[in-house]
Amino acid sequence: MINTNMKYWSWMGAFSLSMLFWAELLWIITH
């Protein structure tokens, strides 16, 4: 259970970081 929970949170963290990265990159390109 702990292993599954850690995988879930690490995946969420990686996903949110990548989304922030792409949002920042698009902002720089479009502005």
Curated annotation (Swiss-Prot):
Predominant location: membrane
Coiled coil, from the record: none
GO cellular component: plasma membrane
Keywords on record: Cell inner membrane, Cell membrane, Membrane, Transmembrane, Transmembrane helix
Keyword Lyase tagged: no
Transmembrane segments: 9-29
Disulfide bonds: none
InterPro entries xref list: YmiC-like
Induction per the UniProt record: Expressed during stationary phase (at protein level).
Subcellular location: Cell inner membrane
Membrane topology: Single-pass membrane protein
Name of the protein in question: Protein YmiC
Taxonomic source organism: Escherichia coli (strain K12)
